[in-house]
Curated annotation (Swiss-Prot):
This is Adenine phosphoribosyltransferase. The gene is apt. It is found in: Cytoplasm. Catalyzes a salvage reaction resulting in the formation of AMP, that is energically less costly than de novo synthesis. The keyword RNA-binding does not apply. Homodimer. One of its GO terms (molecular function) is adenine phosphoribosyltransferase activity. It comes from the Bacteria. Keywords: Cytoplasm, Glycosyltransferase, Purine salvage, Transferase. It comes from Pelagibacter ubique (strain HTCC1062). GO terms for cellular component: cytoplasm. It holds the Pfam family Pribosyltran.
Amino acid sequence: MNLKDYIRSIPDYPKKGILFRDITTLIKDADAFEECINQIIERSKNYKIDKIAAIESRGFVFASAVSYLLKKPFIMFRKKNKLPAETHSVDFELEYGTATIEVHKDSIDKDDSVLIIDDLIATGGTAEAAAKLVEMSNAKIAAFVFAINLFDLGGSDNLVKKGYKVENLMDFPGH
């Protein structure tokens, strides 16, 4: 099964000049979604994994299924002020401004090896912020797994250059 066949491309969304890669067409097809989860697990099996983390919100769709099947704890990286307990937080740059993601301080233990899953990587700013949250807990990144890599935007390559392991299921141009 070619997962790329299940990704809808929407031009000029959310703004002119952007070609949006829509995963909803993949996750609404049970067989395609199952194949995607199986591919994430296959790409992850060579890494030591203590916990699985995901970036809000579409990353949760994939990571919670993987976490369940691998019987590993699931950690949520959330937008600012969405978690009720004490958090670590990281600010990062977006195209137009800054954003903040957080994780509960008690979610990740020292020396944990954390697999980070997200639906898509573009420039990699959010992924780098997630890595910082893991490292603030004195834990390490097992690897990143992205369903979609917008290869011409360079995020995946930037993570590799910083020494992280990266697995991409599908490559698309970002424009």
